[in-house]
Structure formats: structure tokens, C-alpha cells
């Protein structure tokens, strides 16, 4: 199979779809890999590293898209839509429930859109989302602490406190991979940490995991309101695979927070859980202030630590990329049901229910869509 690795063009997106080791693995299987010139520089991979791994380096962006499968990190931007074509396999994070234009472009051009974030194992875990959830979760506590500093617009709080001064209060809404990793870092910084989740079993697991060092609370509107208004830092880490994130924190709740407190919305790429995160920010300009509260709403948080993120992502995605390249998508879906759940668009159909519901589009099951070929 002929595979393309474009250079990411999203603001400060320094990750790359495959590392040189991933390219080497595919070339060893007999596939041809085209890598756009300088695609790996943001992750400190040189063109020579890719060439030594067996890739062909191409200067024209159009050439790297003129392939059978494109492997990326983030969803294509509008200037890349012109490269879409019928039957192209697009393997990347798509987050379509918050991307109506992209969804329509994929449908109109009959692209086979496979989203990392909806590949799901029988135990309901998300193997291609997990590594980036771990990174974003850990980063959320770090950046939250950073923006609590006075010169960054915060109230000037040290999360760990000092003797005689209370610790900062951190509330994390969502106890999945991102929320758990946020709690690990927040605890490491010495904060007073509360996790809210709708699943009592998960709260019990978190209580055991952290040896009772975090407060675990059932997530409901009243508990969220009480936690939010008392917190110095609130981290939103709720995920519904493939669907738009639920709006859990209202504007009235935000108004009750102290001036200079901070919210970090990890779920912003799926629409966000805070009513006041009404715009996506970038690493160049990551925050804005609303009702006195610093809002951090960067959709590609792991792009700030690209070396770690690229290697972690490559470790997870490579086996699926190898399967797609070696068998083609039809046989790959038959061989791996988890991968078939990643199919969001297929030759004019929307094949993920959450995406279809987000925009009032007709939903076609993966099985039915494949039958129409």
C-alpha cells in the first residue's frame, strides 16, 4: 500500500503521524511510505531519519495526499479538504462531533474516515486515545498551576501551599484516563484534589488507586456546583466516545468562582464541558478571561510535548496501521472489531451514531455501509 505522512498544519501542532521507527516497520512489510519534507521536525525527527528508515521524502503537500492511506495526528483543516478523494483511507484523530464542515467534506468526497478516538476494545477502553489522554491529563494540572501564577492572570496561588498556608483546591470532573492522570500530577504538586464521576465503581477504584488521598464525589449538578465554586483550578475531563461532550458546568457556576481561578477544558476538542468555553484557543494564545476566571481551551494540548506524544501515539497506532496497510480496510475490519468501531465515515455514509446525532445526519451502521460496496 502507498501511505502518506503529511506535515501537520494546525497551530503549534508539532506531532507527526508516524515516527521513523513506524515508517521502518511499514516499509519492512513491503509498503511505500511518503513523508512530507520537514514533517517530523517539530518532534525532532529529521528528514534523514525518515529516509534512513526507508521513506520517500516529498516536497509537495499534494504528493503526500495522492496515496491510498494518509496517517495524521489531528483532523484535516479546510485547506486540506481539496485532497480528499473517494476511497482514501484517512487514519487520524477526527473528533467529528465538533466538526460539521469536516464531516460534510468527508461524506461528500466519500472518504474512509477512521478516527483514533473511537477505536474501542471489548472492555470499552480506547487504545488510541489513551496515550494522548494520559499526556493531556498530566499537562492539565501543570498548565493549570502555571496559569494560577499572578503574572499569567491567576490569583497567585501555589497549589502545594507552604507550612501555615492552605493547599490549593483542584476539582477534576471525570475519572477516566485524563482525569486520573490529572489527579496524579495535582497530588504530586501537593494540591487538595477532588474527583467527580458518575460511576460509583470508578470512584471506588480511584479511592483505592490513590489510597484515600483524593476526595471522590458523585458527579451531579449540585455536587459539581459546590466543587466548582470552592476550587482554585477546575479540570474538565469527561468523554463520550465519538460524541459531543456534555455541558456540565454552567455559566452561573463559573460566575461563583473566585477571580483569578483557572479552568482547563481537556474536552474542548469535542465541544467542551464548560458553558463558558465558547471558543477554542491555541498554544500561541492559550487563555482568555471570562467572569474573572482564566479559561484554558487548547484543543491539541499534547502538541506542546511532541516528542513524548508522537512516540506514545505511534506505539499505539502502528499495529492498526500495519493491519490496514496489509489487509485493506475490509479485511482489517473483519480481523479486528475494535478497529471497525473507529470507522466514522464511509463512502458517503456517516457510520458513527454520535456524529450523526450531532448534526442530524442519517446514520448507517458499519456493517450496512460495507454491504453497499
Swiss-Prot record:
Q: Which CDD domains match?
A: L-AlaDH (cd05305)
Query: In the UniProt entry, which residues are flagged as the active site?
Result: 95 (proton donor/acceptor), 269 (proton donor/acceptor)
Q: Which PROSITE patterns does the UniProt entry name for this protein?
A: ALADH_PNT_1 (PS00836), ALADH_PNT_2 (PS00837)
User: Pathway of this protein?
Assistant: Amino-acid degradation; L-alanine degradation via dehydrogenase pathway; NH(3) and pyruvate from L-alanine: step 1/1
The catalysed reaction is:
L-alanine + NAD(+) + H2O = pyruvate + NH4(+) + NADH + H(+)
InterPro entries membership: Ala_DH, Ala_DH/PNT_CS2, AlaDH/PNT_CS1, AlaDH/PNT_N, AlaDH/PNT_NAD(H)-bd, NAD(P)-bd_dom_sf
Which top EC class applies here? oxidoreductase
Reported EC number(s) for this entry are 1.4.1.1
Q: Which residues bind NAD(+)?
A: 133, 177-178, 197, 219, 238-239, 266-269, 298-301
Do the record's keywords include Nucleotide-binding?
yes
Q: Name one GO biological process term.
A: alanine catabolic process
In terms of Pfam families, this protein maps to:
AlaDh_PNT_C (PF01262), AlaDh_PNT_N (PF05222)
* Entry similarity comment: Belongs to the AlaDH/PNT family.
Q: How does it assemble?
A: Homohexamer. Trimer of dimer.
Under NCBIfam families, the record lists: alaDH
> Which named protein is this?
Alanine dehydrogenase
The species this protein belongs to is Staphylococcus haemolyticus (strain JCSC1435)
Amino acid at each position: 500500500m502507498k501511505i502518506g505522512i503529511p506535515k501537520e498544519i494546525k497551530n503549534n501542532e508539532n506531532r507527526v503521524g508516524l515516527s521513523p521507527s513506524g515508517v521502518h516497520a511499514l516499509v519492512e512489510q513491503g509498503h511505500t511510505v511518503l513523508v512530507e519534507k520537514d514533517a517530523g521536525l517539530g518532534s525532532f525527527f529529521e528528514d534523514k531519519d525518515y529516509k534512513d528508515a526507508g521513506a520517500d521524502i516529498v516536497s509537495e503537500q499534494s504528493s503526500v495526499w495522492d496515496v491510498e492511506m494518509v496517517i495524521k495526528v489531528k483532523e484535516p483543516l479546510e485547506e486540506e479538504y481539496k485532497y480528499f478523494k473517494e476511497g482514501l483511507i484517512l487514519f487520524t484523530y477526527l473528533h467529528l462531533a465538533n466538526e460539521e464542515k469536516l464531516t460534510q467534506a468527508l461524506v461528500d468526497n466519500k472518504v474512509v474516515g477512521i478516527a483514533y478516538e473511537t477505536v474501542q476494545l471489548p472492555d470499552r477502553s480506547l487504545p488510541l486515545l489513551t496515550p494522548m489522554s494520559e499526556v493531556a491529563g498530566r499537562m492539565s494540572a501543570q498548565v493549570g498551576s502555571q496559569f494560577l501564577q499572578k503574572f499569567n492572570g491567576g490569583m497567585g496561588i501555589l497549589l502545594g501551599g507552604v507550612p501555615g498556608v492552605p493547599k490549593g483546591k483542584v476539582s477534576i470532573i471525570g475519572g477516566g484516563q485524563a482525569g486520573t492522570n490529572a489527579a496524579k500530577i495535582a497530588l504530586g504538586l501537593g494540591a487538595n484534589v477532588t474527583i467527580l464521576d458518575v460511576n460509583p465503581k470508578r470512584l471506588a477504584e480511584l479511592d483505592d488507586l490513590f489510597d484515600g488521598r483524593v476526595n471522590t464525589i458523585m458527579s451531579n449538578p449540585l455536587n459539581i456546583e459546590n466543587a466548582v465554586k470552592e476550587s482554585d483550578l477546575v479540570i474538565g475531563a469527561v468523554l463520550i466516545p465519538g460524541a459531543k461532550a456534555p455541558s456540565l458546568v454552567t455559566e452561573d457556576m463559573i460566575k461563583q468562582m473566585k477571580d483569578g481561578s483557572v479552568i482547563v477544558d481537556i474536552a474542548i476538542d469535542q465541544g467542551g464541558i464548560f458553558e463558558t468555553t465558547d471558543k477554542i484557543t491555541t498554544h500561541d494564545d492559550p487563555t482568555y478571561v471570562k467572569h474573572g476566571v482564566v479559561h484554558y481551551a487548547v484543543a491539541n494540548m499534547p502538541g506542546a510535548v511532541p516528542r513524548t506524544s508522537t512516540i506514545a501515539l505511534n506505539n499505539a497506532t502502528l499495529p492498526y496501521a500495519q493491519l490496514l496497510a496489509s489487509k485493506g480496510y475490509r479485511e482489517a475490519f473483519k480481523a479486528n472489531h475494535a478497529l471497525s468501531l473507529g470507522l466514522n465515515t464511509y463512502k458517503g455514509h456517516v457510520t458513527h451514531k454520535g456524529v450523526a446525532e450531532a448534526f442530524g445526519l442519517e446514520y448507517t451502521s458499519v456493517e450496512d455501509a460495507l454491504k453497499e460496496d
